[in-house]
A protein has these predicted regions:
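Conserved active-site alpha-helix within GNAT-family acetyltransferase domains
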Residues: 111-129, 242, 246, 270-288
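Conserved donor-binding loop and adjoining core beta-sheet/short helix segment
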Residues: 32-96, 209, 217-228
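Active-site rim helix/loop that mediates acceptor-substrate recognition in acyltransferases
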Residues: 21-51, 60, 180-213, 218
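C-terminal "cap" of GNAT-fold acetyltransferases
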Residues: 132-151, 262, 267-273, 288-302
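Acyl-donor-binding surface of acyltransferase catalytic domains
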Residues: 79-150, 155-157, 293
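Conserved acetyl-CoA-binding loop-helix of GNAT-fold acetyltransferases
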Residues: 81-95, 235, 241-258, 276-281
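Conserved hydrophobic beta-strand within the GNAT/NAT acetyltransferase core sheet
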Residues: 105-109, 230, 264-268
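A short beta-loop-alpha structural element at the N-terminal edge
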Residues: 1-17, 150-167, 172-176
Length: 302
């Protein structure tokens, strides 16, 4: 770590947040109060100073379940600032991964911000996908799918070993962020899903064909945001192209609609045309598009 990239002392958090958020002091002060009120840690708020000691960039790492973290960086306006921000990110990443608590750091960038994306890739991040966020009302009429021969939809929990095996099968030749699963340990992925939002095993569904686990839908609830989220949705390779994706999704939406939350969200790789068509057919609309980038402590590639 170089001596110009440093964690921010508590007394200096307000100016660092101004730089990070690109907002004026009054607005940043309200954000700081909100962070403190909601218990959001700022221990991983970092700054980059120039040779004169002036603040030139800021970054924040927020830890997430499953040994992951999300990165936020200050706006980048020119090449000089880009170079400084790259050095800041490298120092933050080195520090975060060195203690063994974080294996994967994720960033969502603007598709047309070439300077920002170059900074992330120069800092070691991998461009995974153009991620499409979609939303639909959770108050729409949702009916359970009709029964299919030899197909069972169950929310009865299965053993971790069986779930990890099923998840691994759904990653095979997947069109949805195909490189991401290689950057994490399977148990961390499962733990992350369980700790995302308010975990309710009754909102998780396993699809079985003749008693064999063949697909999974993981829905989590986030009351604070008044929403549900399809955190993961996938079919094993042998179960695809049989109409079972629609069958599983309809069941997941039926379960979600029993909850009081206003909306239901999901994210999908823009290259996953079959999934985009399925979600659109069920009333999901595109909200945002972001470039998903990641940096892993594991020696893997996409």
């Amino acid at each position: 770590m170089d001596d110009r990239s440093l964690p921010v002392e508590p007394s200096q958090r307000l100016p660092a947040l101004e730089k990070l958020l690109g907002k004026r002091r009054a607005e940043s002060s309200r954000f700081l109060e909100a962070f403190n009120r909601e218990g959001i840690s700022l221990k991983d708020l970092w700054k980059r100073v120039d040779h004169r000691g002036d603040l030139v960039a800021a970054g924040l790492l927020s830890s997430n379940p499953g040994r992951t973290a999300s990165l936020l960086i200050s706006p980048i306006h020119n090449r000089e600032q880009a170079a400084e921000t790259t050095l800041l990110i490298r120092s933050m990443v080195e520090h975060a991964i060195s203690d063994g608590q974080i294996d994967l750091i994720q960033y969502l960038g603007e598709p047309n911000d070439d300077l920002e994306l170059r900074v992330l890739t120069d800092a070691g991040f991998i461009d995974l996908a153009l991620l499409v966020s979609m939303e639909r009302s959770n108050r729409r009429g949702a009916k359970p799918p009709r029964a299919l021969d030899n197909i069972v939809l169950t929310s009865h929990p299965i053993a971790d070993e069986a779930m990890l095996e099923l998840l691994e099968k759904t990653y095979e030749d997947s069109l949805d962020c195909p490189g991401l699963s290689k950057l994490r340990h399977g148990q961390d992925i499962l733990n992350g899903h369980r700790r995302g939002g308010n975990f309710d095993p009754q909102l998780w569904t396993v699809l079985q064909i003749n008693g064999v686990n063949a697909g999974v839908s993981i829905v989590n609830c986030t009351p604070a945001a008044d929403c549900m989220e399809v955190a993961y949705f996938g079919l094993a390779k042998f179960a695809r192209n049989k109409g079972l994706g629609a069958h599983l999704l309809d069941h997941a939406l039926f379960l979600a609609a029993k909850q009081p939350q206003r909306s239901i969200l999901l994210a999908v790789d823009e290259r996953n045309i079959p999934a985009l068509r399925l979600y659109s057919s069920r009333g999901f609309r595109v909200v945002t598009r972001r470039v998903a980038l990641a940096l892993s402590s594991l020696k893997s590639s996409t």
